[in-house]
From Swiss-Prot:
<keyword id="KW-0406">Ion transport</keyword>
<dbReference type="GO" id="GO:0000221">
    <property type="term" value="C:vacuolar proton-transporting V-type ATPase, V1 domain"/>
</dbReference>
<comment type="similarity">
    <text>Belongs to the V-ATPase C subunit family.</text>
</comment>
<dbReference type="GO" id="GO:0046961">
    <property type="term" value="F:proton-transporting ATPase activity, rotational mechanism"/>
</dbReference>
<comment type="subunit">
    <text>V-ATPase is a heteromultimeric enzyme made up of two complexes: the ATP-hydrolytic V1 complex and the proton translocation V0 complex. The V1 complex consists of three catalytic AB heterodimers that form a heterohexamer, three peripheral stalks each consisting of EG heterodimers, one central rotor including subunits D and F, and the regulatory subunits C and H. The proton translocation complex V0 consists of the proton transport subunit a, a ring of proteolipid subunits c9c'', rotary subunit d, subunits e and f, and the accessory subunits VhaAC45 and ATP6AP2.</text>
</comment>
<dbReference type="InterPro" id="IPR036132">
    <property type="entry name" value="Vac_ATP_synth_c_sf"/>
</dbReference>
<comment type="function">
    <text>Subunit of the V1 complex of vacuolar(H+)-ATPase (V-ATPase), a multisubunit enzyme composed of a peripheral complex (V1) that hydrolyzes ATP and a membrane integral complex (V0) that translocates protons. V-ATPase is responsible for acidifying and maintaining the pH of intracellular compartments and in some cell types, is targeted to the plasma membrane, where it is responsible for acidifying the extracellular environment. Subunit C is necessary for the assembly of the catalytic sector of the enzyme and is likely to have a specific function in its catalytic activity.</text>
</comment>
<keyword id="KW-0375">Hydrogen ion transport</keyword>
<keyword id="KW-0813">Transport</keyword>
<dbReference type="InterPro" id="IPR004907">
    <property type="entry name" value="ATPase_V1-cplx_csu"/>
</dbReference>
<dbReference type="Pfam" id="PF03223">
    <property type="entry name" value="V-ATPase_C"/>
</dbReference>
<protein>
    <recommendedName>
        <fullName>V-type proton ATPase subunit C</fullName>
    </recommendedName>
</protein>
<dbReference type="GO" id="GO:0005765">
    <property type="term" value="C:lysosomal membrane"/>
</dbReference>
Length: 385
């Protein structure tokens, strides 16, 4: 299950009573699996600070989730033909995502609760902002390397009209170091092989008789050599084109051929060298982002609960995993359980279907319910596809 509901309701006499009432209400029809979602005693601050922070946390939530999904998506791209291993590489704090979420514990070392809520939000914003910036740099460099390699590899394949010819020809195919003669490479459609063999010597004067040789062919074309005097090369190219024979620009140079092969080898080596460290970086920083995202959710629950239920802080946060096809019934059950929290609830009993936004009551939420509610979708692969 990839969808989780993070809710909170005020403590009755104790938070444990609220927890037991929730379990009792959802247990009857196995509507959901419920887990306590522990949020530490954070610094409350003033009401004005909470209202301002509520809106900012909504934006931070969207930003951190976006970066988390970007990291997951790019990890899938980098894995290429190993993409089926993406799921096992997406972990949080060395745990799978559902287990981390259902056993959530606040990270006191990274986000000290002695800090104000605003400072904790700023710590997360800077942390994830840096990851986002680093991702842009790393992905840009790796994509450039991959793009250069793909371009070179494309030139090694494809049609004879466009592909690199260096690996198809040999030194003996060419007249080299002659003051008067040169060898051209000509692409001839397969259907015109006979025409070429019968007429290439007549395309211009000064063509060496019986100098043509078929050195390679693909499904559509053949690669022929022809030797002629340098002074008629331009004329030959013009008349060859009129007959649908294409002269490829090519100068045989041993050093250039070796350099070309070395470039591909170097790019392949560089890609392999970068692959491992990049995958490790993406895995580590996916974990960082995901954990930060869930801490933002915890902050939002805390702030919204204080704004809704008042002081002293007394609420029970819970993580619900709706059973398959029971979301509607679970929503109805929660509404019945908590409708008393909202004096105007009888005016919008169908809020769960209509996603009504009540100005001044939702504190940045697009859906309003009598209880604090945030949806968490941890399916990174679906949205990363």
């Amino acid at each position: 299950m990839s969808e989780y509901w993070l809710i909170s309701a005020p403590g009755d006499k104790t938070c444990q009573q609220t927890w037991e009432a929730l379990n009792q209400a959802t247990k009857a029809n196995n509507l959901s699996l419920n887990y306590k979602f522990p949020i530490p005693d954070l610094k409350v601050g003033t009401l004005d600070q909470l209202v301002g922070l509520s809106d900012d946390l909504g934006k931070l939530d969207t930003f951190v989730e976006g970066v988390t999904r970007k990291v997951a998506q790019y990890l899938g791209e980098v894995l290429e033909d190993q993409r089926d291993k993406l799921h096992e590489n997406l972990t949080a704090n060395n745990d799978d995502l559902p287990h981390y979420l259902t056993r959530f514990q606040w990270d006191m070392a990274k986000y000290p609760i002695k800090q104000s809520l605003r400072n904790i939000a700023d710590i997360i914003s800077k942390q994830v902002g840096q990851i986002d910036a680093d991702l842009k740099v790393k992905s840009s460099a790796y994509n450039a390397l991959k793009g250069n390699l793909q371009n070179l590899e494309k030139k090694q394949t494809g049609s004879l009209l466009t592909r690199n010819l260096a690996d198809l020809v040999k030194k003996e195919h060419f007249i080299l170091d002659s003051e008067y003669l040169t060898t051209l490479l000509v692409i001839v459609p397969k259907s015109m092989f006979n025409d070429w063999n019968a007429n290439y010597e007549k395309i211009t004067d000064m063509i060496v008789p019986r100098s043509t040789q078929l050195i390679h062919q693909d499904g559509d074309y053949g690669l022929f050599t022809v030797t002629l005097f340098k002074k008629v090369v331009d004329e030959f190219k013009l008349h060859a084109r009129e007959r649908k024979f294409v002269v490829r620009e090519f100068a045989y140079n041993e050093a250039d051929l070796v350099a070309g092969k070395n470039e591909i080898t170097k790019l392949l080596t560089d890609k392999k060298k970068q692959f491992g460290p990049l995958v490790r970086w993406l895995k580590v920083n996916f974990s960082e982002c995901f954990c930060a995202w869930i801490h933002v959710k915890a902050l939002r629950v805390f702030v919204e609960s204080v704004l809704r239920y008042g002081l002293p802080v007394n609420f029970q946060a819970a993580l619900l995993v709706p059973s398959r096809r029971s979301a509607r019934r679970l929503r109805d059950t929660l509404h019945a359980l908590y409708a008393h929290l909202d004096h105007s609830a009888h005016h919008h009993a169908n809020a769960q279907q209509d996603s009504v936004e009540l100005a001044g009551l939702g504190f940045g939420q697009s859906e309003y319910y009598p209880y604090v509610f945030y949806k968490i979708n941890i399916d990174m692969i679906e949205k990363a596809a």
